[in-house]
Amino acid sequence: MERPVPGQGYGFPRSHRLASPVEFRFVFEDACRSSDSWLTVLARPNSLAHPRLGLALSRKQIRKAVDRNRIKRLVRESFRLRQAQLGTIDYVVMARTPATSVNSAVLLRALEKHWLILTRRCSGSSSP
């Protein structure tokens, strides 16, 4: 992963997060989807000037808090470093149970793949 250059906007402010149920519902209603054994990522173009991230990790799927927190940290860090390339799209990341048994490098590679796929799919979603 590339190292951030100071002053280039690699922060993760509240404005870049999905927080309310209405914002999550907006993405769930008509989303582009990318899935693998560990993660499901939903995406939908927004009308803002930046991408936003929402995390939906259920205790039913990921039982231990330490595992949920590790996955959330990895997703936020991957998003933070890639946000300049992610377009004006809202993303919601959901984890599956097998995500707890895979190492962090594998999850980061999977996220990179999902970001790339969904950025292509959603930016071209206005045409059939």
Curated annotation (Swiss-Prot):
Superkingdom, taxonomy of origin: Bacteria
EC number: 3.1.26.5
Gene3D superfamilies: 3.30.230.10
Catalytic activity field: Endonucleolytic cleavage of RNA, removing 5'-extranucleotides from tRNA precursor
GO annotation, biological process: tRNA 5'-leader removal
GO molecular function, one term: 3'-tRNA processing endoribonuclease activity
Group of enzyme by EC: hydrolase
PROSITE patterns: RIBONUCLEASE_P
GO cellular component term of the entry, any: ribonuclease P complex
Keywords in alphabetical order: Endonuclease, Hydrolase, Nuclease, RNA-binding, tRNA processing
InterPro entries: Ribosomal_Su5_D2-typ_SF (IPR020568), Ribsml_uS5_D2-typ_fold_subgr (IPR014721), RNase_P (IPR000100), RNase_P_CS (IPR020539)
Keyword Nuclease part of the UniProt annotation: yes
Tagged with keyword Hydrolase: yes
Disulfide bonds: none
Quaternary structure annotation from Swiss-Prot or TrEMBL: Consists of a catalytic RNA component (M1 or rnpB) and a protein subunit.
NCBIfam families recorded: rnpA (TIGR00188)
Family: Belongs to the RnpA family.
Function according to Swiss-Prot or TrEMBL: RNaseP catalyzes the removal of the 5'-leader sequence from pre-tRNA to produce the mature 5'-terminus. It can also cleave other RNA substrates such as 4.5S RNA. The protein component plays an auxiliary but essential role in vivo by binding to the 5'-leader sequence and broadening the substrate specificity of the ribozyme.
HAMAP family linked: RNase_P
Name assigned to this protein: Ribonuclease P protein component
Gene name linked to the record: rnpA
